[in-house]
């Protein structure tokens, strides 16, 4: 608009499509305003009040999802993404620093790409990488410092911005826009940006002793705008809003540095944990597995449990080493699920808390080389079982399956009383799909199917290390085997409360 008013002739390149757009603007200004003063006033108004929403759509959006998204965008802006509305409302409350906080928000909002590069950049060695990480952690509450030192991915000013290049100078291109303007690293965060916003707000309010209301309502993403309006926007002063923006950046850095991300894959499912502690592979692997366990045991309504545990530990001015973080997370998790609550009789089919199955699988993985001992006389099946345990990946499998079926499809000689049938020793937790496949098959058939998973003669995977242990060490199933297996697994859970280094 300013170029139209100034009629600047010094543009080195003419973009015909851009010129067509500018002509449309000139026509509008000439039609609706009589004087240059009115046109200038209107142009200044548009410049100060217009907001551009630049949104990267997820790769997994299908055509139906895209149609719905653009329908919302076309309905006069009333149904924009909730976090976009929150962003505008928060920025409107600020009296200064809007530009830096806008850039910071835009960067942390992209959960598909780490906002902080933990691994080495092309232009640095290992010591330089560690120094950059230390500096980022030290500056974690200061978006301006992070921006000045180019510590966040995507926050460095481009050459065009620095040289004052305008839209009018942009050269026309015949190439179609790239599918992704910023290439990701092949992973995405364990939570959406809306979930992350709510986690940050919840902790922010709790630290200030403010009311958060009912948790299920608070963490419902459908209430995102209302929650922010009620809890922060309507009550927060300029200083509090700035503090929240800084907190948002801080927590996103800590999340990227210290918590797992989900790897993108073609049908595969695994986690990644970037770390500057390259020499501590075993400690990083243990931490990754434990964080995976915490994650699959949570939902958007309960993310705050592990999120607060994590931030409590890592919100310091120095990097936290993986073995220290694991020990601290486990200690806090032990407090959340105390040993006193662990009762064998409570681990039955009707009452069991699924957390105990995930905790048990983690402990079996942790002690895999003790439980699946490999020696000169080790059977091929145990060797294969150890290999499976080494590569185990936690998933959100929540279907409780009876090893000895409730209603066998074939005549089964094993007759169980209800207490034995529903006892912990006869239960495993797998996916609903695998549960349906195994369903009412008798023990020998289930064991044969598991063995076919191990030797890859049948497609499928081991979804429970408890199940792997049961089928590896029991050729047949009986009341005695159920009790022996149940007691062995229960003792592993009991012993999991010993010191981490044991």
Feature names for model-found ranges:
Residues 1-502:
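Flexible coil/loop and intrinsically disordered segments
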